[in-house]
From Swiss-Prot:
<dbReference type="Pfam" id="PF01975">
    <property type="entry name" value="SurE"/>
</dbReference>
<dbReference type="GO" id="GO:0000166">
    <property type="term" value="F:nucleotide binding"/>
</dbReference>
<keyword id="KW-0378">Hydrolase</keyword>
<keyword id="KW-0479">Metal-binding</keyword>
<dbReference type="InterPro" id="IPR002828">
    <property type="entry name" value="SurE-like_Pase/nucleotidase"/>
</dbReference>
<feature type="binding site">
    <location>
        <position position="8"/>
    </location>
    <ligand>
        <name>a divalent metal cation</name>
    </ligand>
</feature>
<feature type="binding site">
    <location>
        <position position="9"/>
    </location>
    <ligand>
        <name>a divalent metal cation</name>
    </ligand>
</feature>
<dbReference type="InterPro" id="IPR030048">
    <property type="entry name" value="SurE"/>
</dbReference>
<dbReference type="GO" id="GO:0005737">
    <property type="term" value="C:cytoplasm"/>
</dbReference>
<dbReference type="InterPro" id="IPR036523">
    <property type="entry name" value="SurE-like_sf"/>
</dbReference>
<keyword id="KW-0963">Cytoplasm</keyword>
<keyword id="KW-0547">Nucleotide-binding</keyword>
<protein>
    <recommendedName>
        <fullName>5'-nucleotidase SurE</fullName>
        <ecNumber>3.1.3.5</ecNumber>
    </recommendedName>
</protein>
<feature type="binding site">
    <location>
        <position position="95"/>
    </location>
    <ligand>
        <name>a divalent metal cation</name>
    </ligand>
</feature>
<comment type="similarity">
    <text>Belongs to the SurE nucleotidase family.</text>
</comment>
<dbReference type="GO" id="GO:0008253">
    <property type="term" value="F:5'-nucleotidase activity"/>
</dbReference>
<feature type="binding site">
    <location>
        <position position="40"/>
    </location>
    <ligand>
        <name>a divalent metal cation</name>
    </ligand>
</feature>
Length: 269
């Protein structure tokens, strides 16, 4: 397969380098377009007011293009302009830190995969449940194998496969589970600190309270030692709320007389 590889931790991140080697070892043709600098938690940001510059990286058997931009910039620019061949799949990762539940709203890793899916490419986001991963060669090899095993044709159009690895050695992993996202949310707080020169600053911290995590969801299974697979799609529509909003729809904007509320008027907001 022809694989386009990106991430949000930067082109020199250990996770991307491990994924690159594993994909090559598995016989894939790999083309890297990744951020030059770390872009963690930038979400789906796109650069629109600055030029995008590209730097070539050739070192120790690694070849890739670094973009001075966001993960989404890398995907858009890479697939539109930089790559000579159309990839069969786009892989984003391996990210340092899990991307489960609400994380996907902030994740540059998942956003890169989502952008690829929007552009019509099969997309895989890969993350590891630790911010200080040591050797990710085992996880990368497993992900490369999974890439060839997945039935991409059977997945819905614009589906992103979100793959997360638990923070345990691969021999201790319990197995692989397909599962939904947790709906638990982060409990955030900011530490107020002082820098060495006496200046004041704030540092974000947070946790997903374990008691709020439903069993069988990605966060729960990952904590238990399972590899998790979650299909994602970009559709923020709250379909359950459509009927409520439909009550105030109608023709014109001269009041609620034409709204589909049984013809009643008055009692406005």
């Amino acid at each position: 397969m022809i694989v386009a590889l990106t991430n949000d931790d930067g082109i020199q991140a250990p996770g991307l380098r491990a994924m690159y080697k594993a994909l090559l070892d598995a016989g894939h043709e790999v083309h890297v377009v990744a951020p030059v600098t770390e872009q963690s938690a930038v979400g789906h940001a796109v650069t629109i007011s600055l030029p995008l510059r590209v730097k070539e990286f050739h070192e120790n058997g690694f070849r890739g293009r670094g973009v001075y931009g966001t993960p989404t910039d890398c995907v858009k620019l890479g697939l539109s302009c930089l790559l000579d061949k159309k990839p069969d799949v786009v892989v984003s990762g391996i990210n340092a830190g899990a991307n489960v539940g609400p994380d996907i709203l902030y994740s540059g890793t998942v956003s890169a995969a989502t952008e690829a899916a929007h552009m019509g490419y099969p997309a895989l986001a890969v993350s590891y449940d630790s911010f200080r991963p040591a050797d990710l060669s085992g996880q990368a090899a497993h992900a490369a194998g999974l890439l060839a095993t997945l039935d991409w044709q059977a997945l819905p159009a614009r589906c992103v496969v979100n793959l997360n690895y638990p923070a345990v050695p691969m021999p201790e992993v319990k197995g692989v589970r397909a599962c939904p996202q947790t709906r638990a949310v982060w409990k955030d707080w900011y530490d107020h600190r002082t820098d060495p020169r006496g200046g004041s600053y704030w540092w974000l911290n947070g946790v997903i309270p374990p008691e709020t995590v439903a069993p069988g969801t990605d966060r729960a299974l990952l904590t238990e030692g399972w590899i998790t697979l979650t299909p994602l799609r970009f559709d923020f529509t709250d379909h359950e709320a459509m009927d409520v909003l439909a009550r105030v729809q109608g023709d014109g904007v001269g009041g609620q007389a034409n709204a589909q509320t049984g013809g009643q008027t008055g009692g406005g907001i």
